């Protein structure tokens, strides 16, 4: 995984906690720190769960594919150059836009977040190892916190997540609010609970992700 605390990373954290509570030994490695030596040392004892591989070096990806048992926990569409299937008719990208096909094909399983997510991945990669988890993972603590926030007073503004990541599409949300003459509040990512608390202080959220 990577060190950035976003939705995918929080989901990874809960997933690891569940595995740990069920008696499994979990070793976490940031994607950019994964090496061939780490793979070689652990390939017999561990099954690798790859949640983010964009910062893994190509030779290390080859080592994973050829030497180890691994599962891909897919949070978006990293098999596409654009990572955005919505750009293409019926969510099906041209063949020249596909990447990492062999990496997905060699996995024991590719775990997707929903049945729609699974269908889109399957449509593009044409593989039979793709599965839907039917949702994301949440801790009881976070769910209780969100329920508590839902009861608070709201300002008549729109929350917009401030991000320079292209597929978060902050500019699209701002343009929409300006077009509709809606007041908005740009909220920069921070500590997770502080961030969702800030989001919850407004009546609505405007978000047009590109993936």
Question: Residue spans of the language-model regions?
Answer:
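Conserved catalytic-core segment of nucleotide-activated headgroup transferases in glycan assembly
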Residues: 138-200
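N-terminal pre-catalytic "stem/leader" segment of glycosyltransferase-like enzymes
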Residues: 1-55
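Active-site proximal beta-strand in glycosyltransferases
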Residues: 47-49, 65-94, 111
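Short amphipathic alpha-helix with an adjacent loop that forms part of the alpha/beta core around
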Residues: 36-44, 60-63, 198-199
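A short, active-site helix/loop in glycosyltransferases that binds the activated sugar's phosphate group
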Residues: 105-130, 169
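Alpha-helix capping/helix-boundary segments
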Residues: 55, 78, 116-118
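Membrane-proximal helix-turn-helix segments that form the acceptor-binding/catalytic region
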Residues: 89-110, 119
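Carbohydrate-associated surface elements
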Residues: 116, 135-139
